[in-house]
């Protein structure tokens, strides 16, 4: 019995050591990640390890895992425009590391490569591009400015083996003086538009009055010619038409009775029969 216990004890120690060695030699690379191997004898190996379970030599080697999925990052800076106006800009950058360059990225920058590189090159490119435009141009040509920033920033990031999937301006503000000047300009433009509308309306009314006056003058001239040609006949026709209109109006009123006299004098009688 004692011999069996001694044998079990002697086997337990190597078995525990073996299990520990086996566990330390196995590592997992999760989905969306890649790994590089650092060897104490040869340094960082050039091979990039894909997803899955892998083995290494304990103590001599260790794995460094990188997240290779696209990640967002904001880059903010305050700089001067071409006309010396202060501009505050914020960029939203979607970035990821170049997978095949992970060993070089780890050697030169480490796992926090994005923290070391993106703010630096982002500020550099923003200041360089903004300095080429006036403050007003940054507003009116925002799309062109964004494209210039995106193009230059992609080139700079590629030098560090970082791929940029998207670059966009999410925030742009100016100094108080420029903002106030823009507001005053907008107010002046609105006042000018309002004044132009008033002038156009007055001109339209004037033209309408001219046309109306010309029409009345032509009508008066036509009537004068008709009277001169036909004598009092036209005047009598107009009187009859006016009497007919009055009769139609009074007929619609149940409280009034209209009685033509039938006399030569042309007088009529109105009777109020209202209740």
Curated annotation (Swiss-Prot):
What happens without the gene? Answer: Abrogates mitophagy. Defective morphogenesis of mitochondrial cristae; cells are sensitive to menadione (generates reactive oxygen species in the mitochondrion) and the mitochondrial membrane potential is affected. Decreases formation of secondary hyphae; double knockout with PHB2 exacerbates the effect. Decreases virulence on A.thaliana. No vegetative growth or conidiation phenotype.
Transmembrane domains' residue ranges: none
Query: Which keywords describe this protein according to UniProt?
Result: Membrane, Mitochondrion, Mitochondrion inner membrane
Q: Name one GO biological process term.
A: inner mitochondrial membrane organization
The UniProt entry lists the main location of this chain as: mitochondrion
Q: What does this protein do?
A: Prohibitin probably acts as a holdase/unfoldase for the stabilization of newly synthesized mitochondrial proteins. Involved in mitophagy. Required for the switch to necrotrophic growth.
Q: How does it assemble?
A: The mitochondrial prohibitin complex consists of two subunits (PHB1 and PHB2). The subunits assemble into a membrane-associated ring-shaped supercomplex of approximately 1 mDa. Interacts with ATG24/SNX4; the interaction is direct and plays a role in mitophagy.
- According to UniProt, the name of this protein is Prohibitin-1
| Source species | Colletotrichum higginsianum (strain IMI 349063) (Crucifer anthracnose fungus)
